[in-house]
Structure formats: structure tokens, C-alpha cells
């Protein structure tokens, strides 16, 4: 299907990177190619390495940017961004000037009813960002034990009723496998008390987020990738990260804060000024949010937050 993904905070995210025309850059989440296209406009002799694990994104951008690929200006890497260091090493790259992340599910993945990401479309329970992997939402819902289901719903969905939903799933799958998104939606609705169903948006929203994060190990992959990204940065290199939900934002905020904080030293220890300064500095003391105008155009922008960090 054609890509119709509207990139959120596009110019703000790229502005934080302060692109050098001759630099080496990474788009960790190629998606619809919005950030990739913007970076390419600003490169002259530089090179951009763009990662994605989604077949559709890879095929679409390979066609869109065929000339840039042929010229060696763009390299598309069909891998999860948690392989950042090893994948770039395959191209002889050991340091980069900037990395951009645009996290979460792309509009194309979400709106493709057959991918099973959305509670709005009836489809097989899939939710894989990388169609090559074996684990699907169907496997988790039908095979993972009660305690694991409860942990996933509580931790990744911050669900108010994880025990009730996990128990209801367990009861239903004893009779027959749970195969589709709508079957799961009905089970979740059945598990949640009626007063709670009537407020706070769609009752299955948090549960679907939880299973999607579990299927793709999104938080684990992000932590792995950011750890590598921070080490890959050259002097004056920068990272900008756009998040769309609190779990991701909390992780990014915590990692950036730790890296940009000087180590705590015993009182009275004789040290020279600057001797124990942090190697990184925050580019955003508070996250950047979309403008009112952008949110009016794209309702999915409402929860977006942009954070940045620089290596000194």
C-alpha cells in the first residue's frame, strides 16, 4: 500500500541535528522517509544510513530514493535499529555526526488492517513490525501463561485491569484459540467493568499497545539502540528522539539525564574545574511539543515529544 505517513516534528527534529553537509548520519526509523528526505536535502558529500525492519517501508523508500542510493548518498539497511553498531560496522562506519529516531508504529502500519496493529480493523492477531520474526500477538495471547499476560498488560499498557483481562483471556482460550483483533477486543471489553468502559477512550487501546510492545520488544530494542547510539556519536554529534507514549519518553529522558550528569564525588575531594564533567549535554531541558497548527493538521501529533542530546 502507498505510504501516507505524515511526519511529526520533522523540522524541529532535523534542526536539533544541525546537519553538516559532509557528515555521516543515521535515520534509525526510516518509515515513510520523511526524516531521510529532509536530511538528504542538506547533505552534499555526506552519507545517510537509514534503518527499518518493515518490508513495506524498505520497498517504498528503495523506489523513492533510487537515485540517492545509486549515488552512494543513501544506504538503506533492512534491520532492527538495535543492531546499529554491527550493521554500520559492515559499511566501515564507527562514528556518526547525528542520529534521528521517530518511534512507535507508522500510520501505514497502523492503518493497514491486515497487520493486526489496530483494534479498529478485524484481522489476524499479528502486530509484527518485522514480518520475518516468528513471535506474533496471536502466540502471546494464546500461549503465554497468566502471570506473563498480567505483567505485559500492567507494564507495557499501564492497564488498570491487567488481572481481569489476563484471566478473561485465559478462560476464552481454554475453549478455542483467540485468532483475531475483534475477538480480543470483545474479550477485553468483557473483562473491564462497565463504568470504566465508558470513559478514557477505546477500552482496548492500552491492551493493544501492551501486546504490540511485547511482540516487538520495543523498549528493550530502544534501550539497546540508544546505548549504542550514544557511543557511536562523534565529538559534537547529536541525537534527536521523537516519542509518542510515556514509557518510551521516560526511558529516553532517563538515559539522556544519566549521560549528561556529572558523576557524584565525595565532598572535599580536590578536583580541577572540568575534570569530572559529563561527556554529553542535553539539547532540550524540556521536551519540544508540536505546535497547535501541527496538531490541528495531524491528530496523532498530540502526544509527540522531542528530546535531544549532544556529545561534547
From Swiss-Prot:
Transmembrane segments: none annotated. GO terms for biological process: rRNA base methylation. Keywords: Cytoplasm, Methyltransferase, rRNA processing, S-adenosyl-L-methionine, Transferase. It holds the Pfam family Methyltransf_5. Its EC number is 2.1.1.199. It comes from the Bacteria. It is found in: Cytoplasm. GO terms for molecular function: rRNA (cytosine-N4-)-methyltransferase activity. It catalyses: cytidine(1402) in 16S rRNA + S-adenosyl-L-methionine = N(4)-methylcytidine(1402) in 16S rRNA + S-adenosyl-L-homocysteine + H(+). InterPro entries: RsmH, SAM-dep_MeTrfase_MraW_recog, SAM-dependent_MTases_sf. Its main location: cytoplasm. GO terms for cellular component: cytoplasm. It is an enzyme of class 2 (transferase). S-adenosyl-L-methionine binds at residues 33-35, 52, 81, 102, 109. Specifically methylates the N4 position of cytidine in position 1402 (C1402) of 16S rRNA. Belongs to the methyltransferase superfamily. RsmH family. PANTHER family: 12S RRNA N4-METHYLCYTIDINE METHYLTRANSFERASE, S-ADENOSYL-METHYLTRANSFERASE MRAW. This is Ribosomal RNA small subunit methyltransferase H. The gene is rsmH.
Amino acid at each position: 500500500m502507498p505510504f501516507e505517513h505524515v511526519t511529526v516534528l520533522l523540522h524541529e527534529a532535523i534542526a536539533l541535528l544541525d546537519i553538516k553537509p559532509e557528515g555521516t548520519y543515521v535515520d534509525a526509523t526510516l518509515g515513510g522517509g520523511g526524516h531521510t528526505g529532509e536530511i538528504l536535502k542538506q547533505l552534499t558529500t555526506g552519507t545517510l544510513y537509514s534503518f527499518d525492519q518493515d518490508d513495506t517501508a524498505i520497498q517504498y523508500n528503495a523506489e523513492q530514493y533510487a537515485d540517492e542510493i545509486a549515488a552512494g548518498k543513501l544506504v538503506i539497511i533492512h534491520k532492527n535499529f538495535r543492531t546499529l553498531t554491527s550493521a554500520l560496522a559492515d559499511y566501515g562506519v564507527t562514528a556518526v555526526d547525528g542520529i534521528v529516531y521517530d518511534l512507535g508504529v507508522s500510520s501505514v502500519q497502523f492503518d493497514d488492517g491486515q497487520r493486526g496493529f489496530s483494534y479498529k480493523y478485524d484481522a489476524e492477531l499479528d502486530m509484527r513490525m518485522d514480518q520475518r520474526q516468528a513471535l506474533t500477538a496471536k502466540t502471546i495471547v494464546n500461549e503465554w501463561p497468566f502471570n506473563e499476560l498480567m505483567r505485559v498488560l500492567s507494564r507495557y499498557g499501564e492497564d488498570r485491569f491487567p488481572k481481569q483481562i489476563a484471566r478473561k483471556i485465559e478462560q476464552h482460550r481454554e475453549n478455542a484459540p483467540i485468532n483475531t483483533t475483534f475477538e480480543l477486543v470483545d474479550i477485553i471489553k468483557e473483562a473491564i467493568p462497565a463504568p470504566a468502559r465508558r470513559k478514557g477512550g477505546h477500552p482496548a487501546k492500552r491492551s493493544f499497545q501492551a501486546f504490540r510492545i511485547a511482540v516487538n520488544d520495543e523498549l528493550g530494542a530502544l534501550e539497546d539502540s540508544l546505548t549504542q547510539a550514544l557511543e557511536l556519536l562523534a565529538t559534537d554529534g547529536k541525537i534527536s528522539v521523537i516519542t509518542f507514549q510515556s514509557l518510551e519518553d521516560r526511558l529516553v529522558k532517563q538515559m539522556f539525564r544519566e549521560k549528561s550528569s556529572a558523576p557524584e564525588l565525595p565532598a572535599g575531594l580536590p578536583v580541577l574545574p572540568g575534570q569530572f564533567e559529563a561527556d554529553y549535554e542535553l539539547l532540550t531541558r524540556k521536551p519540544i511539543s508540536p505546535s497547535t497548527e501541527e496538531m490541528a493538521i495531524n491528530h496523532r501529533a498530540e502526544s509527540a515529544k522531542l528530546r535531544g542530546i549532544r556529545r561534547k
